[in-house]
Amino acid sequence: TLKSQTGDLKIKVSPVEGKKDTFTFTMPNVMCRLVVKTEVKGIEKDEDGYCLVGTLDDLNKVKQTIDLGNNDINIKLTNNIVGYDGNPIGEYNGTFDGNGHSITLAMNDESNDYQYYGLFEKLDNDAVVKNLTINGSIKANANYVGAVAGLCDGAIINCVNNATVTNALKDGVTGGFIGQNMLQKSPILISNCVNNGEVNGYNVGGIIGYSAGYTYNFSKITDCVNNGKVNAENNGAGIIVVGSHCMVTNCVNNTNINANKNAGGIIGVVQYGTKAEIINCANNGSVVSKETAAGIATTYGAITVKNCL
């Protein structure tokens, strides 16, 4: 039990590395905010405070730290990492700089324990993933699956996905990079990203599964290219399979889209009651569906298309 006081109170604890511990503090008649952070042991930092990750063991160490609650650490790769077969890295809110390097995934989970599944489970508002290449494969049975993240509220910039992404869940949503992005505090920026990996599932987008913004603040996807084959049991698209208040600019789909319901070269479906803008985009692949197909987009909502091929 701690006596009431004003100002900052620092308490140093020593948890066991790799384990979650519970600490109970009693402060009568006091309202306070408690922040618990853990340091990454055995990891060097550069002059800017980035944790330098060059091995699979290093990656597992920073994953442990993030999972324990220190989710705003900044990370920079110093080497290619091969064979990551663990669970998704938990909710992350820092900057992950691939620094031109790659991570090769061998992730496979059929448990249906995850709503969001990817290298990262969730990317929060201030999270940035940049300059990263993803190789290998990822297989899951989750609501939203993407090679980089199941859910993204942050930014993904200048990244490449070469991994095959497969989601076995019926009604699941899958993207080459992101399963779902939801606009929270500011426009989501997905820019300068290229997908070369095959994407398979029920609702499938080459770049993003479900992309959502607000009427006054659209989510933004810019300068992205899809070269990976899209195989969808339900809806499929080259860039976004389901869009809601989103803007897609300077994006290109170069591959074939195969779906059983709605298929679009850029957007599969614009949701009813929402809007989408597609500007300076091109579809160079064939779009095949048993029901509805369009070179640019199919829609139940309002759509603006400018300078598209």
Indicate residue ranges for each PLM-predicted region.
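Conserved "repeat-terminator" motif of extracellular CCP/Sushi domains
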Residues: E17-K41
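Surface-exposed repetitive/solenoidal architectures
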Residues: E39-L309
